[in-house]
Amino acid sequence: MKKIVFLIGILASCISYAQNFSYPMASPRQVITQQFSVSQVTVDYGRPSVRGRKIFGELVPYGKVWRAGANQATSISFLQPVKVGGKPVKKGDYAIFITPEQHQWKIVLNYDTDAWGAYSYDPNENAIEFTVPVIQTKDLQESLEFSFESLSNEKLNLIIRWEYTKVEIPIEIDKKETIDKIIEQLKEVKQFERDLEGKDN
């Protein structure tokens, strides 16, 4: 009886310990967020790795829609109106789908953010689409990587790197006059807060 109680105790301890961990994923999820203009941009994606394979043109075929990552489709979120690839996009959440070719990629922002991979991709749900040139790199990027570069108050580039391939997706603010008004209002609020602090002192 004591042995049974002991074994149950050990099992309970193991279960409790295991709840603090998760099984290592082949394509772990990553979320990146960049403060931009008066809000922020967030990308949520799975990170597959090369692992000695030929990626573009083989694992990811040319001319076919790709989920831009692994597992659930990659998503991007905007908290203000922007232009992506020169095209206006309302604030909200979008799935990113890509049709890669050797020298250029077609980038699509799609309304179906719950899609698992590209299996249920519906072009009727597209918000915008545009093409960007492919840049070949010398250094191997082992795991798929999204990042933000060339950041200013009005523009930034979303960078996608994998294997020996890189693309740059330009993002800029839309409705500049509205954004300028928001900035002025924020400045007024900050000044009001400083004035209050001065009175308290």
Question: Locations of the language-model features?
Answer:
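Aromatic- and Gly/Pro-rich amphipathic surface segment
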Residues: G57-A73
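Bacterial Sec-dependent N-terminal signal peptides
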Residues: M1-F21
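Primarily secretory-pathway and cell-envelope proteins
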Residues: Q19-P61, A118-N201
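Mid-length scaffold segments of soluble, non-membrane domains
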Residues: A68-Y121
